[in-house]
């Protein structure tokens, strides 16, 4: 299947499908996010949890046009509809990063990646909702990025569900892939933000097996580091019986 998708994307590229891509900012992000502008409501694009919400959910995107845009892939049959979309972030170190890709057709994910490569952008390695900092670089190698975006610190009406840069530090005005004690998690489909009840926003919790010590007591030796021999009861010798 991966080979077929790669083959289809290669053919599409030579057929000048790149001309159907467009980068939009501001209010246009909310416009193209809505499923009324999808060619069909299928694939990962049609099943996205943010495909049928009010535009105010996207305030954090719309209000930060210098660092956030949306790459859309228009339908060849109907340019007023799209076949895919992906957020494009400008990280604090200046790199451009393409986030999770949502498409009607699986093969178009590779087309998005090819388009990103053509523009010198980095692309999320695993096309999922994981808060990972691994990405494909423009030369195709896998790299770990400094995944931090500087945004306006507040004043948003609602908040979107974020796939990757889901930790919002309100005081510092950043989105990142790493939790912190001052961070809120943007993983709510109702437009709210939350501080994780389990980790307090740190992104990690104490191990329940070792209570944070890093070691656990051996159930065979009761933590002594040794146990009595079952053959000699720890005496070191056994009774010899003549046959």
Where in the sequence are the language-model features?
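Surface-exposed beta-strand edges and their flanking turn/coil or helix-capping segments
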Residues: 111-113, 232-233, 242
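Short loop/turn and capping residues at structural boundaries
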Residues: 126-129, 210, 232
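Cys/His/Pro-rich metal-binding microdomains
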Residues: 181, 197, 208, 219, ...
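Periodic glycine anchor positions in long extracellular repeat architectures
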Residues: 190-192, 199-203, 210-214, 221-225, ...
């Amino acid at each position: 299947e991966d080979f077929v998708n790669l083959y289809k994307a290669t053919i599409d590229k030579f057929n000048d499908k790149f001309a159907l891509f467009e980068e939009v900012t501001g209010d246009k992000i909310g416009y193209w996010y809505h499923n009324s502008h999808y060619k069909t409501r299928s694939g990962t694009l049609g099943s996205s949890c943010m495909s049928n919400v009010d535009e105010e959910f996207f305030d954090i995107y719309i209000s930060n046009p210098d660092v956030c845009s949306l790459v859309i892939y228009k339908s060849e049959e109907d340019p007023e509809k799209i076949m895919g979309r992906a957020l494009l972030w400008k990280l604090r170190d200046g790199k451009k990063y393409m986030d999770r890709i949502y498409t009607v057709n699986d093969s178009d994910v590779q087309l998005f990646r090819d388009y990103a490569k053509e523009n010198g952008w980095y692309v999320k390695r695993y096309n999922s909702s994981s808060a990972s900092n691994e990405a494909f670089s423009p030369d195709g190698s896998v790299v770990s990025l400094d995944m931090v975006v500087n945004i306006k610190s507040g004043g948003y009406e609602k908040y979107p569900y974020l796939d990757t840069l889901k930790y919002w530090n309100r005081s510092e005005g950043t989105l990142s892939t790493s939790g912190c004690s001052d961070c809120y998690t943007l993983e709510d489909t109702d437009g709210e933000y939350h501080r994780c009840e389990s980790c307090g926003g740190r992104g990690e919790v104490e191990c329940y097996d070792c209570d944070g010590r890093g070691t656990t007591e051996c159930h065979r030796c009761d933590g002594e580091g040794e146990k009595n021999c079952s053959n000699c009861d720890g005496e070191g010798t056994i009774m010899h019986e003549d046959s």
